[in-house]
Amino acid sequence: MEYGFTGLNNSRQSAVDQERMSIVASHMYEQYNNYQNANLIANGIFDSIYDNMKILTDYFRQTFSARGIPSDDIYCLQDDVTKSLLMSIMWHKIGFTMIFNDKPQVLENSVKSQRTIYSRIVATKGDCIKAINENPDSLTEKIRNMEVASLYVPAQRSMPCELRTIHLINEIHPVSISIENANKEFLLKVIEYVCGGGYVHWQSTYL
């Protein structure tokens, strides 16, 4: 007796089974194509973010130097291994990474069709390159705790990107941004969010 899909092309295999698997194959083929297209568009946005990051880094270096403040801690870099960017503005570290784009993924609760495949660029408060290298076994959890916003990039250029920012009260606020403006708007908003705030002294509990 044969079990499973042994002899799938055998004449005994029903046409119904083949039709069902054909639907699955077509679905996966469509997802794969959309995944490739979304990543292609996202890679272009990612490269443009780095180009704008270098321009802004020069601006901040000049601005602080003109005020007599050392600018050694103002720089940016790209890491191809982790698919990440890092921008340092004095004591603030801002990261962008595409490391999670390893398979086709839809966007939950998207205003668009649930079938739409998106690529994702995650923005972090803190050095995402260091976090990725030091936490290979708990990568998703670590980056999730550092995330301040994510840009979701669709597979079709006619569709807008969706920018989701995480506010201090942990509410997610989605905003639609055109693909043409996504790189600059995403970078500026993240810098405003991270550097426009600050840090709080930790406090001990005294008895």
Where are the predicted features?
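Charged, low-complexity intrinsically disordered tails and linkers
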Residues: 1-22
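Contiguous, amphipathic alpha-helical segments that mediate oligomerization or scaffolding
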Residues: 15-75
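Compositionally biased, low-structure terminal segments
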Residues: 4-6, 30, 97, 101
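Beta-rich nucleic-acid/ligand-interaction surfaces
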Residues: 70-86
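Intrinsic disorder/low-complexity polar-acidic segments
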Residues: 82-207
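Intrinsically disordered, low-complexity segments enriched in small/polar residues
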Residues: 2-5, 66, 93, 196
